[in-house]
Amino acid sequence: MSTANHFQRILEKLSISDNERAVYTKEAEEIQNYVVDELKRVDKTFRQVFDGLSLGGSYLDRVKLNLPDEFDLHMKLKFPFDIRPTRIDQGFIYLEADLTVINPQRIHRIVLQDWLRNAFRKVFRSNQTIATTSNRVYKLTYTLEGYGCAHTILAVCGSRSISFDLVPAFEFSGSQWPFDICPVPADVSNNWPWFAIPQQKKKSAKPRTTFMVCAPHWEREIMKGKDNLKNVLRLMKGLRDAHARKLPHLSSYMLKTVLLHRLESADWERDLGTLLVEMWSHLVDHLRARRLEFFLAKDHNVFNRMNQNEIKICLENASTLLRKLCIAQTCGGSYHHVAQLFNIPN
């Protein structure tokens, strides 16, 4: 069996059946709808401004491995006044609102998160459980309380758990993109929205009012029709997951960003082994340079989310994995050898 077939087999091992995925997804939808309904019940303002949930992360890109037990959701908010994004730099923006008293006035990120935190706490003041239509009873807890970006809900039923990262977001059209360069073609930006999410900008003169751009739908659209791109991303995520302790804070979005920068330059029709070695090699190069440009704003370094020691550890261990991948690819290693790299039992 060729090395390319080994990697294809690994990919199949990392995946789950559509039926199993559907069960988790249905239960997740019931849980998230319950939480939203409870937020509407306890907070009048939330009831008025909530504008729907928008899926993000690996599940939106359809590259989620194993069970769909982690959901990234943008919690869209639409207030009864105009909000305009104004650029700062490095992917950061202010949100200017037309208010009656002061015009314009910036949306205050801390005040926004405090309000949402209070609403969540009202819901979870008492023990929360939900019985799904599949007759499972989940206990719900409110964990990360929006002090970073997300409000996290953990749902547990026996050995089964599902987590939800709910990130407050303001939705904008492509015509409202605040920076000089739009990173995607017009047919994408004109048909899909982007979001502003609460994010602190380090060393900012106005750190309490900064937001950051994100555009998961743009990224999803430009990744379409790229043959093996998504499969390579799945393999990179599987390799990262197998060595997560040795690759601290190396996020799925960082792996995805490595590929986004090579959408047009790489030949995605090549076999999985060749592409995996090439893309993992690019990851190592970025770690060595200690820089990975944000796809939406080149002046922002995505690795800023890691400290220097974490980058050093990631570089050492990613380099070791690259050497092992190269040996497997060039020497025609056995399936057993390749499976070991992914911690997959034979």
UniProtKB/Swiss-Prot annotation:
Record's protein name: Cyclic GMP-AMP synthase-like protein
Disulfide bonds: none
Binding-site list for Mg(2+): 70, 72, 165
Organism the protein comes from: Drosophila melanogaster (Fruit fly)
Cofactor(s) in the UniProt record: Mg(2+); Mn(2+)
Chain positions recorded as ATP binding sites: 58, 70-72, 216-219, 237, 252-256
Knockout or disruption consequences: Flies display a normal antiviral immune response.
Top-level EC class as recorded in UniProt: transferase
Organism domain of life: Eukaryota
SMART domains the record matches: Mab-21
This protein's UniProt keywords: ATP-binding, GTP-binding, Magnesium, Manganese, Metal-binding, Nucleotide-binding, Nucleotidyltransferase, Transferase
Cited PANTHER family: CELL FATE DETERMINING PROTEIN MAB21-RELATED, CYCLIC GMP-AMP SYNTHASE-LIKE PROTEIN-RELATED
Documented activity regulation: Activated in response of some unknown stimulus. Not activated in response to L-monocytogenes infection.
Gene Ontology terms: biological process: copper ion homeostasis
Described purpose of this protein according to its UniProt entry: Probable nucleotidyltransferase that catalyzes the formation of cyclic dinucleotide second messenger in response to some unknown stimulus. Does not catalyze the formation of cyclic GMP-AMP from ATP and GTP.
Entry GO MF terms: ATP binding; GTP binding; metal ion binding; nucleotidyltransferase activity
Enzyme Commission number: 2.7.7.-
Residues reported in the UniProt entry to bind GTP: 165, 212-219
Recorded family membership: Belongs to the mab-21 family.
